[in-house]
Amino acid sequence: MKRFLTAGAACLAMASAVHTQALAQDAPADAPKPMDLPRDWSATLTQDATGLHDIMIDSHPGVHDPLNPAFKPRLEEGLTVALERAKTTTDAGGWWWALRAYVASFEDGHVGISITQPNYGFPTRWPGFLTVYRGADQVVADREPADAATPPLGARLIDCDGVAAEALAEQRIGQFRGRWFLEAQRTLYGDWQFLSAQNPWIGEMRQCRFEADGATKTYALNWRATPEDIYARRAKLAQRAATDFGLKHFDDGGFWISTPSFNGDPSSETLAELTALIADMKTKQDALRAAPYVVLDLRGNGGGSSHWSQLMAQVLWGDAWMAAHPEPAIEAVEWRASDGNIAEISAFLDKLRATNGQPELIAWAEDAINGMKAAHAAGQVYWRSANDEKPADAAPPPPAPQLMAGRVYVLTDSSCGSACLDAVDLWKTAGALQVGRETSADTVYMEIREPVLPSGLAQIAVPMKVYRGRARGNNEPQRPQYIIAGDMSDDAALLAAIRRLQPD
């Protein structure tokens, strides 16, 4: 069976990222920043929304996807909305949030947008408190302690200006982030409910009702600039782990392996750290296989290349076990054969060759380039790379010994997406137990590149290929067998919770 690699966003978005960095480095240090220069923001939105639309038409595999007839109408409807908003856009906030809404309308974590000016952010306002999701409820999790006019910690939001809490979150957050049906999105962005960042397409609420200790009270909101420590406050609420790559061995014989990224960019520090981690795992292979438990920590891992999770599986379970317990085969991968996509993979291949990249990745890139070029020359929309069909009389793989003496736990949080999801798919098929929190999710559109929009102020993420016959469906998260409540950044508490899951 052919194994389809995902080289990942971090690898393949190089060309545009390098171009953007070069532009920033060429500018004099005291030159005005692009986002601060006066401009016609209405015309800029029209230009960039049209450019976004045209890039998608040219290169996104969904445009001609017979299994997704809603894609093209959604693309056109999003442009119509953005162009209508351009008629009344007067500032950078109107431009940015209209484009964010257009991108969010695709309901795809692999379609994204970012501002090219490094570290740019819009000034924010708040009413003196923030809410986050706790299950289905939005509760006050941070407030100015000196402001008696704000709801108490733990108070549950009921509604604002007559709009129910969940509908309000969909309007204020989901409209601009997308995939609001996912628990991970609400976990990651729920604190935006009571933040205002120069978004003219939503207003600032005037009054809200909260329930605390069985009593409901109405609060008038006093919006003002956020305090200087707002980012630290939000980081504390997010409970996101700041993990490093590494392999820890505990006194009870257990192991903890942390992989906060699968970035496969040949020039990245992450590549060196992943390479060193795999080498360390190979050195300790016998001890890992004899351990009472091994924790594969994926907290904070937003993806990269699926190559690394395959290597880790080989070290732990071995090739024979993986062959005897295969994932459901993907039928095929279809690449959108466009000039832009061919150029992106060609740039990636050049970088791989220049850095003596892994032969498997080089062969993968060469195959994709040659296939897309042939399809493009023949006037075909896609180049199809089909999986090898098993003969009807093919014998099943022979039984293989289970080399892992103890349990393998895969620890996930809401950040897990793309190649991180591929890792969860693979490791659970091999026998790992998922613990922690529900992951994010992706669609079957994969392998992004990041072209810059016409204004030069933003760049978008555009998938280049589509999976056919993937077992995990569109926007389907991985849900843990064992949910671990509490702070997902508390390593000691997580280890204690996992140890309690161990069989007696």
Feature annotation, model-predicted:
Residues 24-351, 407-409, 422, 436-461, ...:
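Flexible, low-complexity junctional segments that flank or bridge functional domains
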Residues 353-371, 464-485:
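Extended, charge-rich low-complexity interaction segments
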Residues 370-432, 436, 446-447:
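Flexible, glycine-rich surface segments
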Residues 14-22:
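C-terminal segment of classical bacterial N-terminal signal peptides
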Residues 328-383:
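Low-complexity, serine/threonine/proline-enriched polar segments
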Residues 1-8:
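Bacterial N-terminal signal peptides that target proteins for export
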